[in-house]
Amino acid sequence: MAEPAGFDVDIVPVDVQMQRNQHYDVFMLEHDYVGAFAIGFSLNDPWIQDFKVSHTPAVLFDNYIIGNPSTAYVGIDNDEGMELAVSYLARLGHRKIAYLSSSLGSQILQIRHAAFLRAMHQHGLNTTSSSTGCSYYLSECMEKHLPRFLEKGMTAIICSQDTLANAALIQCQQLGYKVPEDISIIGFDDIPIAAYTSPPLTTVRQDRLELGKSGFFALSSLLNSISISTFLLHAQLIERKSTGEVPVT
């Protein structure tokens, strides 16, 4: 949408060293960029601080900046998405639902974690420290948290990302558990691989094309001095084969 509208679009990889060497506004000015769609920043990245005071329009996909009219956030309604996942599992009879996440270093992962706790509370389902697990490394999630969930008799696991859900699915199978007969697994994002895991992954979809369009609309608004704060899309639960009714004991 941006190119047909007359914009030149560059895809620019950004690492931490680059952010330390040059502030966001300076980088944008030197390269004659009028705005940016920023993806994949962690809360500790230097430019996150820049986005709080920047005058150059920026639309962030996975972080929300408070108080700067030059920035906007686009994404799905994660509260809605987590509610869809929890209510779906509850209808299948699951009461012992765990939540597995990679490091809470990005705001979107913090939002999803909090959304899980709220959704569980709304359905009258208990959560404890033993029913949630967060680690930076995928391997640590599999070695530290997943076995604990299984030992505690969890019958379903919601994962913060599809890649994590796929790893959990494979690990459960290697430990002798059948998915979904013994344990149900739900992912988040609906990346292309989700439809081709074994079994195919039930997940919460965020439509990448619609997110791209939303990012363009938000950035266009900022460039025209329309101060958009958030632009949320509805979440959608994609039911596949990694979830089933609670196992009979």
Regions found by a protein language model. Give the residues of each.
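Alpha-helical recognition/docking segments in bacterial nutrient-uptake
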Residues: 1-87, 147, 152
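Short beta-strand elements in bilobed, periplasmic/extracellular small-molecule ligand-binding domains
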Residues: 2-14, 117-139
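Short acidic/polar active-site loop segments enriched in Thr and Asp
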Residues: 34, 95-97, 155
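Alpha-helix capping/helix-boundary segments
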Residues: 43-44, 104-105, 112, 163-165
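An alpha-beta-alpha
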Residues: 83-123, 230-243
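Short acidic capping loops at alpha-helix termini that bridge into adjacent secondary structure
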Residues: 95-96, 127-130, 179-184
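Flexible loop/turn connectors
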Residues: 143-249
